[in-house]
From Swiss-Prot:
The gene is aroK. It comes from Buchnera aphidicola subsp. Baizongia pistaciae (strain Bp). Its main location: cytoplasm. This is Shikimate kinase. It catalyses: shikimate + ATP = 3-phosphoshikimate + ADP + H(+). It is found in: Cytoplasm. Pathway: Metabolic intermediate biosynthesis; chorismate biosynthesis; chorismate from D-erythrose 4-phosphate and phosphoenolpyruvate: step 5/7.
Length: 174
């Protein structure tokens, strides 16, 4: 990867997009952005609050606006929210403005990684199990992730460092 192209990380919640993104940006000396953190920084409230007050539609509008602004930058690593790919406009922009890396993970891994986090609005369910919600999200979203991915990384039990260096190796051959 001779010139610094934008790198966009997509995938479901709990896949490790933010963690991998931060480490990848550091290794490549690139600027890192997390779309959820950018929304929180600009609004002064957390994502859960936005979901409670504005609903998912209100949140998605904010997310689309912020991602559209961020991807106009050059030489960045962006960790997107799991549902950002629901927008055709965002999918098209990500595809045309950088390398899209899909961090693929199982529902079982998501359950382990998200069980202690009470800040995930889509997992605040009453009569439905979290596993059922994650399975439904995977059913609808995984084909969208796959449709725009330039590179797919199966997240497994490898260390963060090993995954980051594997991604860098793939990017060098891209």
């Amino acid at each position: 990867m001779t010139e610094k192209r934008n790198i966009f990380l997509i995938g479901p919640m709990g896949a490790g997009k933010s963690t991998i993104g931060r480490h990848l940006a550091q290794q490549l000396s690139m600027e890192f952005y997390d779309s959820d953190q950018e929304i929180e920084k600009r609004t002064g409230v957390d994502v859960s609050w936005i979901f409670d007050i504005e609903g998912e539609l209100g949140f998605r509008k904010r997310e689309q606006k912020i991602i559209s602004e961020i991807i106009d930058k050059r030489g960045i690593v962006l960790s997107t929210g799991g549902g950002s790919i629901l927008s055709r406009e965002i999918r098209n922009k990500l595809s045309s403005r950088g390398v899209v890396i899909y961090l693929e993970t199982s529902v079982e891994k998501q359950l382990v990684r998200t069980k202690k986090n009470k800040q995930r609005p889509l997992l605040q369910v009453d009569n439905t199990s979290i596993q059922t919600v994650l399975e439904e999200l995977a059913f609808h979203r995984n084909p969208l992730y796959q449709s725009i991915a330039d590179i797919t990384i199966r997240m497994n039990d490898r260390s963060i460092k090993a995954i980051v260096f594997y991604i860098i190796r793939l990017l060098n051959n891209f």
